[in-house]
């Protein structure tokens, strides 16, 4: 959303290099690498009915309680990569469902954001959340989670970005860190 992708696609030579410094104002310190992210909807389905005859339907929002239970019981990992510590996070960030105040909802979506440490690839992160063979990819609709935290639920991918290893094994990185620490 900041336009960097357009620059990278139009002028890859502008960003080619052996080393990069990205300004990050938080604490003005050096942070190596970054967590990756996958964002996806976990979907429940019900049967719409008038709320005066709720027994004729099935409430998809009520079924979302199981999704929230799994999120609540999940323990976020703390992972060390190249001597740096990364904290993972698995959180619901949005919930949507229902079409009216007197209609039993036939769908509910819990939007989930998983921030994963640089010891994992995108594929490994997805496998932990939805199973290795779920098939959910950006733009290909809803797929059934075959394993992972959300096994049995519908999954629709919304966004993904790989993690970045810290590169502390690079002489350039070590030199910069030593220089910054000395000042």
PLM regions with names:
Residues 25, 32-33, 39-183:
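Metal-dependent amide/peptide-bond hydrolase catalytic core
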Residues 1-39:
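Acidic/histidine-rich catalytic neighborhood of metal-dependent amide-processing enzymes
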């Amino acid at each position: 959303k900041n336009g960097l992708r357009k620059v990278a696609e139009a002028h890859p030579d502008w960003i080619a290099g052996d080393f990069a410094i990205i300004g990050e104002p938080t604490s003005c310190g050096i942070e190596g690498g970054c967590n990756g992210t996958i964002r996806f909807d976990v979907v429940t389905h019900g049967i719409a009915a008038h709320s005066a005859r709720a027994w004729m339907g099935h409430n998809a929002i009520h079924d979302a309680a199981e999704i929230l239970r799994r999120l609540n019981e999940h323990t976020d990992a703390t992972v060390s990569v190249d001597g740096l510590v990364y904290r993972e996070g698995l959180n619901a960030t949005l919930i949507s469902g229902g079409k009216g105040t007197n209609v039993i909802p036939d769908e509910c979506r819990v939007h989930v954001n998983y921030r994963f440490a640089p010891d994992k690839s995108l594929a490994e992160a997805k496998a932990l959340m939805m199973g290795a063979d779920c098939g959910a990819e950006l733009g290909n609709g809803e797929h059934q989670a075959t394993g992972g935290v959300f096994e049995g639920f519908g999954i629709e991918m919304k966004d993904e970005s790989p993690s970045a290893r810290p590169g502390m094994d690079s002489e350039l990185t070590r030199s910069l860190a030593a220089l910054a620490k000395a000042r």
